[in-house]
Amino acid sequence: ILPSDLNFLKADAGNLMSFMPSGAQWTILIAVAAFAAFVALFVFLNRLDARHGRLFRGSDKQSRSVNAIARLLLILLPGLFFTLYSMQVSTVGSWAKGFATVMGDKPSMWDSVYDAQRNGPLVAFTRQLNPKVMVKPDDYSEETMKQVAARYEKAAKKINAKRSANMTDSTVIYVLSESFSDPSRVPGLKVNKDSMPKIREIKQNTTSGLMLSSGYGGGTANLEYMGLSGLSMANFDSSLTSPYQQLVPSEHWTPTINQMWGAAKNSIGLHPYESSMYSRATNYKKFGFSHFYTLTGPDVISHQDKIDDSPYVSDEATYKSTLEQVKKTKSNQFLQVITMQNHMPYHKWYKHNDFKATSTTDKPLKDDEQESIETYQKGASLTDDATADFLAELDKLGKPVTVVFYGDHLPGIYSSASADDGNSLALHQTDYFIWSNKASGTQGNKIGNADYSSPNFFVAQAAEHMDAKVSPYLAFLTEMHSKISEIG
């Protein structure tokens, strides 16, 4: 249970039971019955107790006063402690956060269910009650915001005077490719062959570059949020580690770029894994997506094929499901695709894997590190093939389509390279490109200042690539990207 779930009690209590998993009703009934039994037991034991609940013996006025004060303190002090703890446990550096850590709390913000199972439902619940979102600027006011809005309205008019199209005249597909990156860029690592030759060629002929990731080995949803909202994680306080879990559930409305395409039917999400991860199922509804296709539903993704011994749905299958959605309608859409094929761990999943990795330092790779890297390389090469085939199919369509493709972070398998702090930047750079099909009229476009970027800038870059007009907000992102290429 999340704090945001309590909104159902006042807004949608009638449908609350429909959100519970199968069998949950019996679990609740058993818990209520057990609680009632405990209460009855305590009442019975109280009657057997000669003191009748008194902490100190004695029936005089002073003893009664001492008992009353003791009872009051036993109620107030724990209540005060719990209140103060709940208000501060989500803030980095607070006494409550330190206390929780000492007591063994290990936040698992990627999955609220796992977090509750690992740390306890109450701990998982309280950490999301009062997260510190961001520091309020000293000069923040209505007047200041009006000035900012006017400044970027003017900037948007200047940009739009030189552009002729609209983003919503095309279908735009965001592809977050799980852990996709170039192993040949990892310091101290030598690979026997290129795992991404086709994507490398695609990058040479369209807008492309390197993306600075805020994560290494994880943090997918944060990069996803940045791409959809245009907001960087750098905007938030360090206490806010997962917007999907700590911020979005409590927001009445969350502005996301897919909403430019109007009605919810024009926004589709696809992710071949569990819909509960990062609370995506509920968050995507709030973002304005009509469907979010996953393995667990309620909208079930159509293609679920896996490759050899891999436990994850292949990118080829995910692209097939995406193509089906694109072909379903003549209308233009926004599609958010989050792949799973290259998710960790990596244990000799693929047959006929001829990829090899060795160390260029005086320390050879450990067996488990080498196995993971070589398995990952094969997976990346399969992504390379599937992505090229996907774009080829989009090129056959008669309607304009633009694809924003990016790897969210490097896989957390380079233990040798990550041991050296000097390799930090290299281990946080992935590949991205913005590509348009023939029907778009912007195929082959290459915009300036594309060598380095971050997901929050992709929408502004896509607009420039598509020669599309911008809103004041996109004008702001365009101007910021021209001054600061990458913000993690």
Model-assigned labels for residue ranges:
Residues S170-S177:
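Short, hydrophobic/glycine-enriched beta-strand segments
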Residues I1-D169, K190-L210, L247-E251, P255, ...:
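N-terminal secretory/membrane-targeting segments
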Residues K157-R163, S177, D182-G488:
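Solvent-exposed soluble domains appended to multi-pass membrane proteins
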